[in-house]
Swiss-Prot record:
Assembly and oligomerization: Homodimer.
Positions marked as site (Important for catalysis): 144, 193
Pfam families to which the protein is assigned, alphabetical: Iso_dh (PF00180)
GO molecular function terms noted in the UniProt entry: 3-isopropylmalate dehydrogenase activity; magnesium ion binding; NAD binding
Gene for this chain: LEU2
UniProt protein name: 3-isopropylmalate dehydrogenase
UniProt binding sites for substrate: 98, 108, 137, 226
Binding site for Mg(2+): 226, 251, 255
Originating organism: Candida boidinii (Yeast)
Length: 365
């Protein structure tokens, strides 16, 4: 029996981040219990407020170096009122690690882990049932990283949006490979503002060319971002598939999409530095929710982090079967009504984690 060893750097961060990472590790260890040939080597490091308290900086050098040498990074959450908005802030650690690891693509799925949760959506259940898309957001270009002029008292300020062909090419390839991981391949939706912005016209032209030349079996449809925002509320299933867009549009549309499933405690995310064509992309995985400093102990929903770990298994660790088993285990547990308070249940964080770990072992035995 050949041993598969995967090195995972854990960055629990602050407040509930510690709890949710513990539950995700519990799930990963449950895989090794029934499949001893799969071994996870965990290495804990500090980030965010916890790192500031211990070292004075939000991301210690040793944490960054460990992340660079790992197969993947699993992060909890950072921040909290304790650290305020001073010169050194917890969130700076997150921004730095994303930049240093060159995480250029952010993936945020929008779906229902169980149909039992449809009534939690602020939209009508018959409108949202069947919603299943992933927003692929370009993470290191665009207006957030463009030239900036601050108001110096003159009453003028500006931000500039720019994209290069290589930047658009690589995010398009990311979307294409994610599409191809499904049989049949998923449709691709590209969101832009090509009727106004020059950068969007370059974006649209480049997306079209890459799909046509490199992925002729795939389909891509273009949608103006303002129209897409309306579709997302009126009929979100129309965007099912892979949704690709630039940094600012992706920031906004993924936050809009995040309210559809009814709780941030359900939503995973991945930030990748390379293509998942061999299911071994390097990535950082984290829940979409924050550190929730006011939440009592053992009340946080761990599912977003557990589903982030499932994404990690499939995209970075080449353990697709195991990742699918984790997602199925989450569905089974929710179908049984085992859930935390944000979903209307009365189970604790650890009870939900224990139940999912049990189902994972049954599925993989």
């Amino acid at each position: 029996m050949s041993i598969i060893e995967k090195k995972i750097v854990l960055l629990p961060g602050d407040h509930v981040g510690v709890e949710v990472v513990e539950e995700a590790v519990k799930i990963l260890k449950s895989i090794s219990e029934v499949k001893p040939e799969i071994q996870f080597k965990f290495e804990n490091h500090l980030i965010g407020g916890a790192a500031i308290d211990a070292t004075g900086v939000p991301l210690p050098d040793e944490a960054l170096e460990a992340a660079k040498k790992s197969d993947a990074v699993l992060l909890g959450a950072v921040g909290g009122p304790k650290w305020g908005t001073g010169e050194v802030r917890p969130e700076q650690g997150l921004l730095k690690i994303r930049k240093e690891l060159n995480l250029y693509a952010n993936l945020r799925p929008c779906n229902f882990a169980s149909d039992k949760l449809l009534d939690l959506s602020p939209l009508k259940s018959d409108i949202v049932k069947g919603t299943d898309f992933t927003v692929v957001r370009e993470l290191v270009g665009g207006i957030y990283f463009g030239d900036r002029v601050e108001d110096d008292g003159s009453g003028f300020a500006s931000d500039s949006e720019s994209y290069s062909v290589p930047e658009v090419e690589r995010i398009t390839r990311m979307a294409a490979f994610l599409s191809l991981q499904n049989d049949p391949p998923l449709p691709i939706w590209s969101l832009d503002k090509a009727n106004v912005l020059a950068s969007s016209r370059l974006w649209r032209k480049t997306v079209d060319r890459v799909i046509k030349e490199e992925f002729p079996k795939l389909t891509v449809q273009h949608q103006l971002i303002d129209s897409a925002a309306m579709i997302l509320v009126k009929s979100p299933t129309k965007l099912n598939g892979i949704v690709i867009t630039n940094n600012m549009f992706g920031d906004i549309i993924s936050d809009e999409a995040s309210v559809i499933p009814g709780s941030l405690g359900l939503l995973p995310s991945a930030s990748l530095a390379s293509l998942p064509d061999t299911n071994q992309a390097f990535g950082l995985y984290e829940p979409c929710h924050g550190s929730a400093p006011d939440l009592p102990k053992n009340k946080v929903n761990p599912i977003a982090t557990i589903l982030s770990a499932a994404m990690m298994l499939k995209l970075s660790l080449n353990l697709v079967k195991e990742g699918n088993a984790v997602e199925e285990a989450v569905r089974k547990v929710l179908d049984q009504g085992i859930m935390t308070g944000d979903l209307g249940g009365n189970n604790s964080t650890t009870e939900v984690g224990d139940a999912i770990a049990k189902e994972v072992k049954l599925l993989l035995a």
